C-alpha cells in the first residue's frame, strides 16, 4: 500500500540526496580550494543525515505504509517478536535514536565553529586543526551512554489490525530514553541560541564590504540551518506536549503538529545542501556546471583565499 505521502517523501528525498551528494562531490574534488573546517563538518553531517533519513524508511515509513496483504508484509512478519529472525532490526532502531542525538549535537558544534571564527580568528585554525575530529568522535560516541539499551534489548515489528499497518517496537525503556533526548535537545538548542545571538550582534556590525566575505556567508549558512533546527525542535516539543495533554488531538495546535511531524525530520536531514547552495555562489555555479558539462575542471576553481569576496 504505497500512500501518496510515502511516494512524495521518496521523490523529494531522492532528489535532495542527489543534490546533497553533488555538493559533497564538488567539495571533495576541490578540497584544497575549500580547506575549511566548517566544510569538513558539512561533509560529516552529510553522512549521518543521509543515514538518518533512509534509516527511517526501515524503522517507520515502510512499516506504516504496509498492510497485511501488501508485498512487504511477509518480510515484516518475519521481524515479529517471536520470529527469531537474524535481521538486525534493533540496530536500525538504535541508529534512529542515536542519530537524533547526533543531529542536535552537530547543530551546537557548527554554532561553536562559527563562534570561534568570529571571536577568535587568530586561534581558529589551531583550535579546529586539533579539535575537529576529536569533537566529531565525541558527537558519535557520547550518545551511546543513553542509546546502548536499544542494542541490548529486542526490537521487532508488530502488526496493528486497527490501522492495518506495522509498528516498530522495542523492549528497551523508551520513556527513559525520551527524557534524555528531550534534555539533550533543550540543552543543545539553548546553547546554540546563545552562541548564534552573540555572533549575530557581532556580525551585524560588519561593514557592507565585510558582509561579502566568506566568514559572513558561512555564518549565514550556519544561522539559517540553526533556525530550521529550532523550527523542527518546536514541532517536536509541540508533539510531546500534545501527547501529554491532548492525546485525542482535539486541539488545532495538536493537529497541526501531527500534520507537520512527518516533514520535520526530513527538513532537519535534507535542508543543509539547499542552504549552502543559496549562500555560496561558487558552489551554486559548480553544481550548474556538473549538470551542463558533467564535470568541474579544477583549473576553473580559484583557491578560497584568492577568491574575491563577492564570488564566494
From Swiss-Prot:
Q: Which UniProt keywords apply?
A: Membrane, Transmembrane, Transmembrane helix
Q: What InterPro entries does its record include?
A: 7TM_GPCR_serpentine_rcpt_Srg
Report any Pfam family annotated for this entry. Answer: Srg
Which Gene3D superfamilies does this one have?
A: Rhodopsin 7-helix transmembrane proteins
Q: Which domain of life is it from?
A: Eukaryota
Name one process (GO BP) from the record. Answer: sensory perception of chemical stimulus
Q: Per UniProt, what is the membrane topology?
A: Multi-pass membrane protein
Q: What cellular component GO annotations does this protein have?
A: membrane
Query: Is Magnesium one of the keywords UniProt gives this record?
Result: no
GO molecular function annotation: transmembrane signaling receptor activity
Q: Where in the cell is it found?
A: Membrane
Family listed: Belongs to the nematode receptor-like protein srg family.
Q: What is this protein called?
A: Serpentine receptor class gamma-31
Species source reads: Caenorhabditis elegans
Name the lineage. Answer: Eukaryota, Metazoa, Ecdysozoa, Nematoda, Chromadorea
The primary gene name is srg-31
